């Protein structure tokens, strides 16, 4: 079976992580996007032009339109199964219209909030692997970080207001846009990473952990984030979850306060367990196997 992946903009380098996941288990995969990412990822999907799409995907049996980019269906082989891979804002704002463009028996969703919007949803979290070693926090002050890709939608103003004067830790944050590699370095300098605190976007439910939270977890950071409308979907799909989900400001305060009460050796153990959890559930191989279990079930 030959699998195709296609999108216009590969937000958060998500499609590339799925490409790597399929390649990790030996699946024949075609993966392109229309333009380079503004975050300057060291590695990302190759770029294609629209006139080349039909030929490039002519041999694909199943094609995932990542980020709900339904517009490319017209260029794809009629015999192929075309699946919506719903990942974010585009689907959130126009899910009914986008659903009408796909006839595949499943929808792959990257966010739990989409489980009530998508026909026959199959949940798949992005894949992240990291060579960064877990930092030992014994005998030193805990560092809490926040480096949003988009402060306006990550709840940065509220996060900074809440954590600026937090006790028993050092809070560091920046809204400066840097390269992806530089951002990973900033995150690695933290022990606890606060990804987001925002329950709505454009009047729609919002607030589900993203790639940055997973990148932090893959380094062994303790991550505080959100999973609005999860309703047990993560645990049902993957089992134990090592992310710390909060619903609101009070939840953020309580979770951080609870974590900071522990001694350094306990926190180091939690960080090691978080990295092991990522390697088990969200490595390239694990993600590729889960995706193919969905596709093979068609």
Label each residue range with its predicted role.
Residues 196-212, 225-237:
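Nucleotide-sugar-dependent
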Residues 84, 89-91, 103-135:
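Donor nucleotide-sugar binding/catalytic pocket of nucleotide-sugar-dependent glycosyltransferases
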Residues 264-296:
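A charged, aromatic-enriched C-terminal amphipathic alpha-helix characteristic of glycosyltransferases
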Residues 218, 222-226:
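Short hydrophobic beta-strand element within catalytic cores of glycosyltransferases
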Residues 16, 32-104, 109:
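Extended catalytic core of nucleotide-activated donor transferases of GT-like folds
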